[in-house]
Amino acid sequence: MADSSPASFLTQADALLRKNLVFQKRNIWSNIRLITIPFFLCLLLLVIQMLFDTQFNDVHGQCGCNEKTCGLRYSTSEQAAFCAIPNPPQWTPLLQIPAPEYRAAIPYPSHTSPATFLFTGNNQSLGNILMGNMYSNSSGFDGDLAYYVLGSSSFPAYTNHMDSAFISDLPIYNIQHECSPNSSFSILIHQSPLAFPKEVNCVQGLNLWRNSSSDVNNELFKGYRKGNPDKKINEFAGAFDFQNTNGNNLNVSVWYNSTYKNDTVVRPMALIRVPRLVNLASNAYLEFLKGSETKILFEYVKEMPKPETKLSLDIASLIGPLFFTWVILLLFPVILTTLVYEKQQRLRIMMKMHGLGDVPYWIVSYTYFLLISILYMLCFAIFGSLIGLNFFRLNDYSIQLVFFFICINLQISVAFLASAMFSDVKTATVIAYIYVFGTGLLGIFLFQFFLEDPLFPRGWIIAMELYPGFSLYRGLYELSQSAFAGDYRGIDGMKWRDFGNGMKEVTCIMLIEWLLLLGLAYYIDQIIYSRKHPLFFLLQSTSKKKQHFSDNKISKVVVEMEKPDVCREREKVEQCLLKSTRDSAVLCNNLKKVYSGKDGNPQKLAVRGLSLALPQGECFGMLGPNGAGKTSFINMMTGIIKPSSGTAFVQGLDILTDMDRIYTTIGVCPQHDLLWEKLSGREHLLFYGRLKNLKGSVLTQAVEESLRSVNLFHGGIGDKQVSKYSGGMKRRLSVAISLIGSPKVVYMDEPSTGLDPASRKSLWDVVKRAKRKGAIILTTHSMEEAEILCDRIGIFVDGSLQCIGNPKELKSRYGGSYVLTVTTSEEHEKEVEQLVHNISTNAKKIYRTAGTQKFELPKQEVKIGEVFKALEKAKTMFPVVAWGLADTTLEDVFIKVAQTS
């Protein structure tokens, strides 16, 4: 038994989900191609990686060997970095001393310029003592480098397997209070199997007091090339802030030049020579407390053992941000064009008019896109891991899961939001791909440049990350850098403990944007698509009552200007409105639609205060010339546009406030067929039947009956895809869709357009049966169709209802004459005209062309028999090719009303 109640949320969601699954099944190969895109892109990365490996993996990119043995002794300086080091060497700890030409000095640096240290604190005298304890006063070399304060101006290495200071041509510096002749000496550094002779040159250590840490910061910054107007480098060796240090407490902050770490994309971060600075401050304090004999010797720094390696370049991690941005964003055009296609083809409004609510549509559509995106990203990550891409293999998979999940949800939200701005698929597609490729290019050439610039304000970075494409790029950049560094150092990539390196920031931004943009997209959809008031969630029922009251006042102004039958219809409507219960299927109360003028044009009154009462079981026909307002009326009744004033009630529900409930009771056959080409006729009816709350055997039976009624059952036509249907078959399917579920009110816009006579007659029988169960509003240009189907007809001209009544009443009211048609040769037209005036003195010629003339003969002046006698007599006087006498047709009534209005 059929359930007449509206379909529940779950029923609507089930109907849409089933339809989408069938539709995607028909597009299975397109979906497979989409899912396999990551596989081929990962293969492309693998090929690029192999090409780079082939280029780099020659003898210069690996440890040197003789016939059987590999090691440092068989390696060149280029090959030594790749050799295994089971017992790493011990290197004397050094300070980072500026090169002579860059040292802070007045008036300008030279090779004798001192290495300057700034210091500050709460107690200047204590600071002077501590800084005085920093350097040794020994002269000559006693064999133990740990007692000397040594430094180098060479750039530090990335590991301590080989200290660049001892293998470079630059000297080692011995920092002294004052340089004596014996302060410089030569040493030989033994690191089996190698030995490095080095010159140790004395450099004076100059300590300068500053009053505050702010002064220290200011002077350090001015020593930077961009920190002074002369663009000169005046570099300090270091700085100390002893703060509240006293005899019971050591509290010191150390400044050092962090630019030596070379933390760029081109090469990994170097080890900065900071430990010796901390050791100097500690030993200076110990000497202050215990005397000069108390020291903690910092004897050496030593790297962890390393295996033999080969020169490799993780190209996938290096180009990952650009490449992976494009890969992930390729889903955006797919989602956007799908949403815009449904809007362009008006498929969504068709579903909405048959009862599909906005919430089920959003949830099912969003879930579908989310599942496709998840499957896409899973394939991407799995394929990337299987072929060994470090981006996936080294970074924590749980971090990738969280990041990609938030990312694809944000992308879907952006697509829903963007779909409100487009009504054409081609335009949306072009803009979407510009967004995809433009984001990648701007990311690598603009955003990444600012991201790696340490002077670029962090606030601006966050502002740029508000653009979803840049937030995606930033996350991929962080993952790529972690994978690259992990591969270089032989460790894992990003772990949760590393999540604060920018990843946390961008993940929070994307999460917040996902929720905000999704809510904004739904709000805009309600405003633009569902035509709701911008403050629809705040409106109260009082506005509704106020609107109805004003409408009733307006209606009295226009009554006197209307014709009697139209006035009677308006009075009927007003009487119905006064009743507590409204039995009419459709009740229009002074419905008006005004389109605002554009480009200086005046306003367009499309519908001028229409009042109409349509009872159950009636078929009402709307006739009128193009532009009369019929389509605007249908669009208002189906919720596509809002009335400028007035309202209408469908089954007692107001179109201004209850449109969602009205959709569950109506059926619509639009002027143009709104169908899915990949679905069959049966699948269309099953979908719309479920929206009408039909289930089980009732649904199956209703679909079978619908297919039979419109001649789409036999020969398996109903199971063929709509793309194989003719225009007439599609039209019949549209009619069947509008009638399935026995809706209480059906709107049919030219339902028989494009049908052959047999199909048209069959369709008329279907409509006749349907009106027994509800009311039908039908627009047509076929007078025959209107006369056969419609119980009442209304003729619209220039937005106004000019007359209303059943076909016989209208023909009687507007057609009190016969139409006489006579065809002769042109030279006898005068004789024909004289003959007609002899029959009726008030005869009126309404048509003339090439010897054929039409005349209107008032019925009260002529008898049909006299007309026959007169024409038979005329045949004896001049040749009459043809003649005919006809009663007034509905078409004549239509033409007369249209011309006189």
Swiss-Prot record:
Entry keyword Acyltransferase: no
Family annotation (PANTHER family): ABC TRANSPORTER A FAMILY MEMBER 8, ATP-BINDING CASSETTE TRANSPORTER SUBFAMILY A ABCA
Membrane-topology descriptor: Multi-pass membrane protein
An example molecular function term from Gene Ontology annotations: ATP hydrolysis activity
Family annotation (PROSITE patterns): ABC_TRANSPORTER_1, ABC_TRANSPORTER_2
A Pfam family of this chain: ABCA12_C
Ranges for domain ABC transporter: 586-823
Classification lineage: Eukaryota, Viridiplantae, Streptophyta, Embryophyta, Tracheophyta
Recorded name of the encoding gene: ABCA8
Organism for this UniProt entry: Arabidopsis thaliana (Mouse-ear cress)
GO CC list: membrane
Gene3D superfamilies: P-loop containing nucleotide triphosphate hydrolases
Record keyword Transcription regulation present: no
Domain of life: Eukaryota
Membership in a protein family: Belongs to the ABC transporter superfamily. ABCA family. CPR flippase (TC 3.A.1.211) subfamily.
Localization per Swiss-Prot or TrEMBL: Membrane
Binding site for ATP: G624, P625, N626, G627, A628, G629, K630, T631
InterPro entries in UniProt: AAA+_ATPase, ABC2_TM, ABC_transporter-like_ATP-bd, ABC_transporter-like_CS, ABCA, P-loop_NTPase
Protein name in the entry: ABC transporter A family member 8
Keywords carried by this UniProt record: ATP-binding, Membrane, Nucleotide-binding, Transmembrane, Transmembrane helix, Transport
TM segment ranges: 34-54, 315-335, 369-389, 402-422, 427-447, 460-477, 508-528
